[in-house]
């Protein structure tokens, strides 16, 4: 009997956690961060990120900073 009550309590807790996670996913923030999906029309990237036309996700504004010599910058 005790284990049945524990299973019911844990089941309700898991159901609550899943429903709250789903609610957070549905009410996402207004802009996307790194590798969030975007299309440039209805979903946008936050400042510091651009929507990649190739992959349709948010990428950094300056992706090649580590490949350039220290004297040159893209931004």
UniProtKB/Swiss-Prot annotation:
The keyword rRNA processing does not apply. Keywords: Disulfide bond, Ion channel impairing toxin, Knottin, Secreted, Signal, Toxin. It holds the Pfam family Toxin_12. Residues 22-29 form a propeptide. SUPFAM superfamilies: omega toxin-like. Expressed by the venom gland. One of its GO terms (cellular component) is extracellular region. It comes from the Eukaryota. One of its GO terms (molecular function) is ion channel inhibitor activity. PROSITE patterns: HWTX_1 (PS60021). Its main location: secreted. Disulfide bonds join 31-46, 38-51, 45-58. Residues 1-21 form the signal peptide. It is found in: Secreted. Probable ion channel inhibitor. The presence of a 'disulfide through disulfide knot' structurally defines this protein as a knottin. Belongs to the neurotoxin 10 (Hwtx-1) family. 43 (Jztx-49) subfamily. This is U9-theraphotoxin-Cg1a. It comes from Chilobrachys guangxiensis (Chinese earth tiger tarantula). The lineage of its organism: Eukaryota, Metazoa, Ecdysozoa, Arthropoda, Chelicerata.
